[in-house]
C-alpha cells in the first residue's frame, strides 16, 4: 500500500493501527466492537464485553471456531448519550459489501440476544435497545424545557 500511494510504510501503519475499521488480522463474519471510551465504560461497557466473550467462548480479537464472530474494542462511536453501545461490522456479504450498525443502550443480556439473532441469520433492529427512549432523547421523556421560558424581568432595557 505504501508503495502504491508513495508514502513511508510507517504512515500506512499509523493509519491502520489508529482506525479500528482496518482489520490487520482475521475477524469473524460479524465483528462485534465494544465502545471503550469513558461514557460507555461508566455505563457498563466492560460488562458488555465480558458477556460477549463468555457467551462466545473467545478472548478479545479471537474468532469463534465457526468463523461467525469476533469481539474487539472501538474508540468513541459518537453516541455517548445512548451509552453503552456496540457496533456490529457485518461482513456476511464480503468485505466490499459490509455494513456497520450501532446498537445503543445495550445490556449484557441484550448483546447475547443480538448475537443469537445474528447466528440465526436474522438482522436485529439497530439503534437504541431501550424501548423507553425516542432516538437520543432521555429515557422516559424530556425533563427540562417543557414550556416556553419566562421572559426577562425587564424588556425595556432603558427603563431598568
Model-identified regions with their sequence ranges:
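Signature of N-terminal electron-transfer/Fe-S-associated modules in redox systems
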Residues: 1-160
Amino acid at each position: 500500500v505504501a508503495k502504491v500511494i508513495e508514502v513511508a510504510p510507517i504512515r500506512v501503519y499509523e493509519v491502520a493501527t489508529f482506525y479500528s475499521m482496518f482489520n490487520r488480522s482475521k475477524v469473524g463474519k460479524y465483528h462485534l466492537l465494544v465502545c471503550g471510551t469513558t461514557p460507555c465504560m461508566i455505563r457498563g461497557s466492560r460488562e458488555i464485553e465480558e458477556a460477549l466473550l463468555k457467551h462466545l467462548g473467545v478472548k478479545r480479537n479471537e474468532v469463534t471456531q465457526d468463523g461467525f464472530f469476533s469481539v474487539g474494542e472501538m474508540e468513541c462511536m459518537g453516541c455517548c448519550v445512548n451509552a453503552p453501545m456496540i457496533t456490529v461490522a457485518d461482513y456476511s456479504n464480503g468485505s466490499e459489501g459490509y455494513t456497520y450498525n450501532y446498537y445503543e443502550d445495550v445490556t449484557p443480556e441484550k448483546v447475547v440476544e443480538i448475537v443469537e439473532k445474528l447466528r440465526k441469520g436474522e438482522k436485529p433492529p439497530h439503534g437504541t435497545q431501550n424501548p423507553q427512549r425516542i432516538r437520543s432523547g432521555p429515557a422516559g421523556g424530556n425533563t427540562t424545557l417543557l414550556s416556553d421560558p419566562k421572559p426577562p424581568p425587564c424588556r425595556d432595557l432603558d427603563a431598568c
